[in-house]
Amino acid sequence: MCSYYHMKKRSVSGCNITIFAVMFSHLSAGKSPCGNQANVLCISRLEFVQYQS
């Protein structure tokens, strides 16, 4: 999972990784092996809306 954080620049394909990085840092703090960065994924915007609410 950690590799996704380093590959974020390559995964930019219609979604704003920067926003996900910020939001996930609050959502998944301490819940993943490598901390906040592990869950920084380019998920669909529909899923992102669900995470916001």
Swiss-Prot record:
Record bears the keyword Oxidoreductase: no
InterPro entries: IGIP
Subcellular location: Secreted
Signal peptide: 1-30
One GO CC term, this protein: extracellular region
KW Signal (keyword) present: yes
Record keywords, A-Z: Secreted, Signal
Cited function: Enhances IgA secretion from B-cells stimulated via CD40.
Name this protein carries in UniProt: IgA-inducing protein homolog
Taxonomic lineage from the root: Eukaryota, Metazoa, Chordata, Craniata, Vertebrata
Gene this chain is encoded by: IGIP
